[in-house]
Amino acid sequence: MTLFTRRNLVTGAALAAPLIANPSLVSAQVSEALVGSASDAERIAMDAYIYGYSLITTEVTRVQMSNVPALGGLHGPMGQFINVKRYPPADYRGVSAPNADTLYSAAWLDLGAEPTVFSHPDMGDRYFLFPMYSLWMPVVECPGARTTGGRAASFLITGPGWSGQVPSGMREIKSPTRYLLILGRTYANGTDADFAAVNALQEQYKLVPLSSFGKPFTFHAPPVDPNPGFSMTDKPQSVILSMSAEDYFNRLARLMGTAAPPAPEDGPMLARMARIGIAPGQPFEAAKLDLTVREALRDLPQRALAVIGAGRSSLGNEVNGWTVTKGLGRYGINYMKRGVVAAFGWPANLEEDAVYPNTTVDSEGRVLNGANKYTLTFAAGQTPPSTASGPSPCTRSTKAGGLYPIASTSSQSACAMT
């Protein structure tokens, strides 16, 4: 039997809970003689890569968006809203499959030192939502017209382990990770007058540290890290592909041990990963793996992305040639679906707020071509619902996930309804 590591970690359900509650216990459970096949280790490495893909993607995106000294374009310091004043242009790639009916308001929060109070004004009957994403990418909460209504409100957003007094009249939103993304959307009908009205609302979206709530507060941007360790301009997927498997797993282990504790239901996966030396807060040492396994790790990023790409069918069901998404925003232990969304649709709304039926072929199975004209047909009385104060039910996107330009002659395109 081939040695795949010189360390033996107690595995199974008995290890899972201690790993989550106190990752430092891993080092206390190391002995010297676990053996197993190299193929076992390679499968674990593949599963671990997919498991961590949403976390690494979100962390890379966080740094690229927020490691800046001031607001500019689609970037802004931690703790400050980036308010987009008009519909996104056709070349916008900040999120996958954006819509052209709402104006975006995005902010990254650091909840490590203290909670943040998020406030919005009275929104009337205007459609809006503020989905909040953990570093692992699931939606933590989604204040908005559908869930909390249009009245002015304040929310206390707290990080892992916080315990304290929640101010009267506030609802606590508990983030499972130190960093959290708010990706707000506010409906606008496209006229200059309505853009101005929404822009005025955006100026009233406030983020204040709990210690400063109700007091005069002046925002100060946190210091910029001059060496984030990867490109600030390449697409996250390209950044991740450029990482070696050892670098990737070390980043994953560091994040799990600090900013992004694994979920309780991740226990069995943590126990498997520990068998090849991947554990929260512990260094991953590829040199301690068998040579065959180390060789397999060399092209793991490319192979794993191919596996994730092949897993797109996990996003939903096929109906009349369309893949109709199901269960986005809540992933549980479906790490493949979470990885697919991270790679090709980051970060995705809850299905109560958006469904993403998509196709790249016409009714006869031919690949969509931007040079052609197509008709999208709904049965009588079965068009997607919409209201005067809410967004259009249908947005077209290119295959790459951007908005579909009206004059596009792209050789391939995709349709999506959001």
Indicate residue ranges for each PLM-predicted region:
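A compositional/structural signature for long, glycine/proline-rich flexible linkers
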Residues: 29-418
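N-terminal secretory signal peptides and thylakoid transit peptides that target proteins
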Residues: 1-16
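Hydrophobic core
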Residues: 18-20
